[in-house]
């Protein structure tokens, strides 16, 4: 993480912690925009939760720095306690008062802060809590309890929403139930979120920025699609790149949505979508093939000029190529997984200009961002 400087920058989340807590040795530094979702990803036990607790001020490392949107929470001379950081920290298993109804729980949390971000009625509407207001936690499902915990956290009028693996115990159907509410929070409130998870599928759906951890160390940090091309993720069997595109139109004759990304254009089979809507496209490495010349006649609709920036072995028979699409002033990353035989037969090398043929990217569960 060379080049990191400990300064509070407006519009950024600045974090640097070094030291040991509860047998976890942290060596973490990253800087990400203080907007959207920053996911912290890594295997269980790598220090994600310890890092989250340091950011929230629940645990303290003497050698630490934390600043949010230009406001210093911890440095050599400052340590702001948790109640002064205005962090909404939602745990894996929500802690709720068993004797209070949903209504009374929300009103209790609303009474402690002026509604600068959202008020009681706004939370009830945003999280669909109206039918649950007279119930107690024992009469709520796990996802309903999670929604109540989110609502209570938001009524604290936080500067930062910190979610520590909130979907870790959920099956896929339960995750699909709660994820849209997280997306509604993101779309409705100007509130940065740090999302702790070891499930890359959830991260691909939610995150704008990604911080990767291993053995207590931050190994990479940056925009999601850039960090997805890091060897640690690009080498995974399910490697993919997520691209945030804009709907540019619809081909009604063939049922194809037209998507724009800088100067690139994608055609994707889908129902009509509102022009101008933002849409996340997931392109798996295995869905991209490589050609050295532009195809003259092909069933592949999406073909782009690209340059090979890295090649990573994948088992004995395959190679993962890290590509940069030529889409204007700055390139867009893409991954392609091909056989070693094809790599050698095409005489590919780092820096080679090629044509990336994308079979058909997939939209997220709901597609919209």
Swiss-Prot record:
Membrane topology classification: Peripheral membrane protein
Broad EC category: translocase
SUPFAM superfamilies: MOP-like, P-loop containing nucleoside triphosphate hydrolases
Domain ABC transporter as annotated: residue spans: 10-240
GO cellular component, one term: plasma membrane
ATP-binding listed as a keyword: yes
Function in brief: Part of the ABC transporter complex ModABC involved in molybdenum import. Responsible for energy coupling to the transport system.
Quaternary structure and interacting proteins, as annotated: The complex is composed of two ATP-binding proteins (ModC), two transmembrane proteins (ModB) and a solute-binding protein (ModA).
Protein name: Molybdenum import ATP-binding protein ModC 1
Classification lineage: Bacteria, Pseudomonadati, Pseudomonadota, Alphaproteobacteria, Hyphomicrobiales
């Amino acid at each position: 993480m060379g080049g990191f400087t400990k300064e509070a920058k407006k519009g950024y989340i600045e974090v640097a912690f070094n030291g040991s807590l509860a047998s976890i040795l942290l060596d973490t530094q990253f800087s990400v925009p203080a907007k959207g979702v920053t996911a912290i990803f890594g295997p269980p036990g790598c220090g994600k939760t310890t890092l989250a607790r340091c950011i929230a001020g629940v645990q303290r490392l003497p050698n630490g720095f934390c600043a949010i949107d230009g406001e210093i929470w911890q440095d050599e001379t400052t340590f702001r306690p948790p109640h002064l950081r205005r962090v909404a920290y939602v745990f894996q298993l929500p802690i709720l008062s068993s004797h209070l109804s949903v209504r009374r729980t929300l009103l209790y949390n609303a009474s402690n802060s002026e509604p600068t971000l959202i008020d009681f009625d706004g939370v009830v509407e945003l999280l669909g809590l109206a039918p649950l207001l007279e119930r107690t936690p024992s009469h709520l499902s796990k996802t309903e309890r999670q929604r109540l915990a989110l609502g209570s956290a938001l009524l604290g009028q936080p500067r930062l929403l910190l979610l520590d693996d909130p979907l870790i115990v959920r099956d896929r159907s339960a995750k699909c139930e709660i994820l849209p509410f997280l997306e509604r929070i993101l779309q409705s409130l100007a509130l940065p979120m740090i999302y702790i998870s070891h499930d890359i599928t959830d991260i691909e759906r939610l995150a704008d920025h990604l911080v990767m951890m291993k053995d207590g160390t931050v190994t990479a940090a940056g925009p999601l699609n850039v960090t997805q091309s890091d060897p640690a993720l690009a080498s995974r069997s399910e490697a993919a790149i997520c691209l945030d595109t804009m709907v540019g139109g619809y081909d009604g004759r063939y049922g194809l949505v037209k998507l724009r990304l800088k100067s690139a254009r994608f055609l994707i089979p889908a129902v009509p979508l509102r022009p101008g809507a933002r849409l996340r496209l997931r392109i798996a490495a295995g869905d991209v093939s490589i050609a050295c010349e532009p195809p003259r006649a092909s069933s592949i609709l999406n073909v782009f000029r690209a340059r090979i920036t890295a090649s990573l072995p994948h088992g004995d028979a395959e190679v993962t190529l890290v590509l940069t699409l030529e889409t204007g002033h700055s390139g867009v990353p893409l991954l392609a997984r091909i056989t070693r035989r094809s790599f050698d037969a095409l005489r590919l090398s780092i820096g080679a200009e090629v044509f990336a043929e994308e079979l058909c990217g997939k939209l997220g569960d709901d597609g919209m961002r």
